[in-house]
């Protein structure tokens, strides 16, 4: 990967169109397809469409070792309300399916971002009974974090393996491993993708602890501040971000990218806040080699303007550095 500061854009309903894809030429470094939100049967179509409308490279971002909700219809809950999560064929389930067997009574679940928290109060072979510990909304495909303990999951899902197989046929050269937790995760990913560019995502307390070891095995890392905040608490994100970048500087040729909430305001508004501008500048000043736009370009109303503002901030940072 090049030494220039990179911009990674997540594609979604707002940006998977000819106009935005054409706009990204010479402005964006990578276009991210998030397999947590891309249907397997649509992947070939998306890759073909992207390649026809832009020369910007594609990055396949795996689902990785994360638990997600599977429900037919979103539902609102009050505090202390009881609900069930079924193992199979229920209105509310979890993905990947094998996680059901790993959950225990008293496990505390944090679902989505500021959406809902609940505790498992009973379990049988068919379903879990949970009691909400906050009010909130339960929606489909939301990340689920187990607050009280670490659950070992496969580093890639079946869907991930299928996506990698498809991507290889299209000669995609860039891949990201979500929830890189251990040295073994990196070794396994390197083995199945030996020649491709790989980005390893730091999204858990375990990953932060192991980051020093990670830098000996790979070159490109991404701090996902959203999922990481579920594991180490949001107030510790600035500390973790600085720690990881500081460690990266002790190793030659290491790149740290940062994601989540850089321009959250621009999902609905044409201009960012002063705090967002400051966050971007501070991240660059710390030594971030790349910045990631997620919801801003995937579902935001102004994906092109978000990219333009990020480019402005990078230019200002570079110019100020020369003063």
Please tell me what each predicted stretch does.
Residues 1-323:
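Non-catalytic helical/linker scaffolds that mediate oligomerization, partner binding
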């Amino acid at each position: 990967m090049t030494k220039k500061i990179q911009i990674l854009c997540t594609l979604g309903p707002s940006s998977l169109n000819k106009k935005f894809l054409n706009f990204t030429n010479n402005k964006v470094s990578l276009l991210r397809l998030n397999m947590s939100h891309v249907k397997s049967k649509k992947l070939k179509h998306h890759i073909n469409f992207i390649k026809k409308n832009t020369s910007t490279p594609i990055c396949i971002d795996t689902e990785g070792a994360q638990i997600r909700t599977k429900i037919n219809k979103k539902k609102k809950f009050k505090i202390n309300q009881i609900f069930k999560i079924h193992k199979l064929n229920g209105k509310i389930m979890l993905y990947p399916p094998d996680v059901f067997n790993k959950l225990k009574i008293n496990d505390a679940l944090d679902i989505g971002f500021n959406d809902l928290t609940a505790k498992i109060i009973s379990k049988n072979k068919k379903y879990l009974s949970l009691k909400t510990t906050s009010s909130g909304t339960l929606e489909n495909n939301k990340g689920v974090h187990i607050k009280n303990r670490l659950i070992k999951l496969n580093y890639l899902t079946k869907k991930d393996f299928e996506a990698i197989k498809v991507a290889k046929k299209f000669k995609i050269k860039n891949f990201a491993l979500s929830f890189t937790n251990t040295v073994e995760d990196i070794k396994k990913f390197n083995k199945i993708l030996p020649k491709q560019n790989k980005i390893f995502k730091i999204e858990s307390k375990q990953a932060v602890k192991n980051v020093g070891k990670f830098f000996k095995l790979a070159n490109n890392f991404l701090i996902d501040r959203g999922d990481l905040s579920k594991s180490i608490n949001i107030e510790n994100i600035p500390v973790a971000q600085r720690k990881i970048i500081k460690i990266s500087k002790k190793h030659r040729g290491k790149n740290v990218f940062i994601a989540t909430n850089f321009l959250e305001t621009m999902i609905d508004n044409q201009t960012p806040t002063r705090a967002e501008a400051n966050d971007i500048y501070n991240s660059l000043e710390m030594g971030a080699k790349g910045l990631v736009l997620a919801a801003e370009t995937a579902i935001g109303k102004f994906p092109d303007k978000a990219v333009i503002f990020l480019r402005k901030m990078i230019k200002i940072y570079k110019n100020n550095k020369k003063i």
